């Protein structure tokens, strides 16, 4: 069994669950935040939409410098409409799925590094990055967004079983 055959069923389930949550995000609450030190609903929704945009580069390049010396630092999207957020999410899901399906041989055991100004912050095998930096990271922010929805009396969709709202 290759990597795609083992990870894509889980990937598809988690992306469908994430989309269900993003579909509930109200545009009039994008600026809402639970605490002054917390990110807003909009920031979390944008982050969920962007995370999968990192997959192709992670699987094909050896590193990513999100703040290169002499270059422009990476900027997270700041989309302000529900439709734009969902469209970015859908595009990134499709691109990530295609990149995962194309993984060959020892590609996942090869190291990949996250850099800041040329300095490695972390270096791990690509498979570890996929699990922690992509899937676990996405599920973490999805859970935060679910709490934010709940705090705003917005029905939370079930992920693995029906939610208290279903």
PLM feature spans:
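Short, charged, low-complexity loops and linkers
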Residues: 1-9
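Short, contiguous alpha-helical
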Residues: 8-19, 29-73, 114-166
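Surface-exposed helix-capping loop/turn segments at secondary-structure junctions
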Residues: 24-31, 99-109, 150-156
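Acidic/histidine-rich alpha-helical segments that form the ligand environment
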Residues: 76-114, 125-142, 147
């Amino acid at each position: 069994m290759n990597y795609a055959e083992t990870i894509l069923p889980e990937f598809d389930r988690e992306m469908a669950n994430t989309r269900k949550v993003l579909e509930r995000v109200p545009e009039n609450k994008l600026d809402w935040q639970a605490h002054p030190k917390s990110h807003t609903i909009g920031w979390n929704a944008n982050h969920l939409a962007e995370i999968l945009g990192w997959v192709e580069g992670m699987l094909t390049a050896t590193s990513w410098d999100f703040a290169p010396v002499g270059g422009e630092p990476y900027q997270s999207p700041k989309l302000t409409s529900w439709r734009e957020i969902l469209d970015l999410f859908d595009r990134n899901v499709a691109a990530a799925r295609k990149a995962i399906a194309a993984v060959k041989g020892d590609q996942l055991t090869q190291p990949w590094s996250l850099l800041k100004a040329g300095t490695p912050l972390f270096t791990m095998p690509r498979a570890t990055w996929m699990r922690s930096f992509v899937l676990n990271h996405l599920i973490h922010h999805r859970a935060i967004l679910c709490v934010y929805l709940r705090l705003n009396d917005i029905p939370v969709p079930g992920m693995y079983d029906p939610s208290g709202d279903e």
